[in-house]
């Protein structure tokens, strides 16, 4: 049976860098940014694209979970449906970008898709550090990203992750090599590799 681990954290927390280290040892699936054609339009116009983009994310996770559900091993994901629902979609509802009716529809799909994540590894990072990393990597889709959004995202993560029983928190303000070594040691203990 598959054991799903999700790497969680705000934008710029080091998820992709960590995944690059982990994929040498484990089956890893990074966020399918190439499948998210609505990501850039969402960043440019959240009001218009919030709901369609969150559905696109949800369906991409459904596709991914369909391919891994029969794997008899550890599979590590860069984010998971939990964060789509509890972090991003909830924030968009709070901001009025997703209506209560759209949220109800989203939740009905989410509940029917029955996603399971066995462990969340949360990369806890100061939004200032994350914003600096975002500026340095200079991704086209993130050029309009605002610091205030990261702060709010961080607050949402802190509030929601504290409700999880199956979470391991890692200080991601440290250099990514140290973060990677910490996570590899954890996974080695958990997975006996």
Curated annotation (Swiss-Prot):
Substrate binds at residues 31, 43, 54, 79, 142. InterPro entries: DCK/DGK, Deoxyribonucleoside_kinase, DNK_dom, P-loop_NTPase. This is Putative kinase protein 029R. Transmembrane segments: none annotated. The active site is at 78 (proton acceptor). ATP binds at residues 9-17. Its EC number is 2.7.-.-. It comes from the Viruses. It holds the Pfam family dNK. The keyword Cell inner membrane does not apply. GO terms for molecular function: ATP binding; deoxynucleoside kinase activity. Belongs to the DCK/DGK family. Keywords: ATP-binding, Kinase, Nucleotide-binding, Transferase.
């Amino acid at each position: 049976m598959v054991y799903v681990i999700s790497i969680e954290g705000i934008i710029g927390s080091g998820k992709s860098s960590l995944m690059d280290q982990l994929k040498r040892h484990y089956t890893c699936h990074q966020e399918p940014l190439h499948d998210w054609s609505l990501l850039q339009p969402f960043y440019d116009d959240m009001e218009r694209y919030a709901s369609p983009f969150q559905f696109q994310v949800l369906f991409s996770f459904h596709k991914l979970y369909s391919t891994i559900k029969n794997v008899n091993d550890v599979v590590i994901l860069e984010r998971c449906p939990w964060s789509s629902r509890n972090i991003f979609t909830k924030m968009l509802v709070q901001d009025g970008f997703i209506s209560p009716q759209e949220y109800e529809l989203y939740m009905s799909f989410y509940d029917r898709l029955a996603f399971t994540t066995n462990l969340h590894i949360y990369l806890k990072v100061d939004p200032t550090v994350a914003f600096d990393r975002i500026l340095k990597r200079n991704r086209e889709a993130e050029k309009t990203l605002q610091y205030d959004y990261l702060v709010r995202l961080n607050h949402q993560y802190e509030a929601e992750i504290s409700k999880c029983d199956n979470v391991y928190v890692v200080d991601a303000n440290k250099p990514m090599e140290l973060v990677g070594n910490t996570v590899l040691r954890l996974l080695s203990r958990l997975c006996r590799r």
